[in-house]
Amino acid sequence: MEDQETRQNREYWFVVFAAILYGTITAGGQFFSNLGLSLYEISFYPVLFVSLILLPIVWTKRQYFIKKEMILFFVSYGLIGAFLELTQFGGIVLGVPVAIVAILLYSQPIWTTILGKLMFGELITNRKILAVSLAFLGIIFLLKPWHIESVGPITGIISALFGGLFLSLWVVWGRKSGIDKKHFITTTFGYKSFSAIWLLLLWPIVGFFIHKPNIVRLSISFPSQYWFYLLIFAVISALVPHLFFYRGIQKVHASIAGIILLLEPVSAAILAAILFAQAISFNLISGGALILFSNYLVLHEK
């Protein structure tokens, strides 16, 4: 019994570690944006690199290969991933302030708690409700939306709201892969490879509606060091955290994982302070403390 509890605690910490590493996504996105890469390039190339890195492993180790009965699952999961990439940036493109977009994206634990109940029968306890409420309050403290004069167009708001829903679906599909006992390497490869395919298929459609090169350009004419930076970014922000996340969520409920993942903006804010000399404010400290406390609540729920 003690060994089982130890193993379960280990799975929780796998998700915590993944959430912290996911915080590099924001800092990396800002870094590559400063270099002049488009949003589509920042989204697509790391996804492609993760797929290519794992391809030899999946190809030579047949136990990791995507079996025929898994294809439909990964086709749908990849589509969720592609829509997540597009909707999380769609609000910003359409003129919604970043703080509002982030708040709507991080409504994810609310959706995840509901979907976890509907799909997996996960209990919605008072402790979970309190943890979600504290975490969401922490996000509001982090982002300070009261400083914003306008929330932007309704189309951008809807896009960001759907981004939160697709982020939740990403967590829920990840949990389903764990319940179905798919290996975490298989899930990482399947999710990323099918997301890359869907991003390519959707690219001309997105380009039809959005004509800004800094959004939809997909070029290979980069200096060689940019490719190296993209490779490192893919490993740190996607490959490693995905492997830990999909390993952990084999045992961790989707609703709990959704709350733990709110450590990501705390990690992102700290990285921004270190890498881009952004100030560590009272709002960051208080918001981060609320999110950490919400994680304490779910990690110690009996």
Which residue stretches match the model-derived regions?
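Hydrophobic/small/kink-forming positions within alpha-helical transmembrane segments
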Residues: 23, 27, 78, 82-86, ...
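C-terminal transmembrane-helix exit sites in multi-pass transporters
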Residues: 53, 58-59, 108-133, 266-285
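Hydrophobic alpha-helical transmembrane segments of multi-pass integral membrane proteins
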Residues: 9-14, 40-56, 72, 133-134, ...
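Glycine-/small-residue-enriched transmembrane alpha-helix faces in small-molecule transporters
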Residues: 1-45, 87, 150-176, 201
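C-terminal-most transmembrane helix of multi-pass membrane proteins
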Residues: 2, 47, 145, 226, ...
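Specific transmembrane alpha-helical segments of multi-pass solute transporters/efflux pumps
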Residues: 21-26, 59-99, 141, 234-252
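Specific alpha-helical transmembrane segments that line the substrate/conduction pathway
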Residues: 41-48, 89-123, 254-273
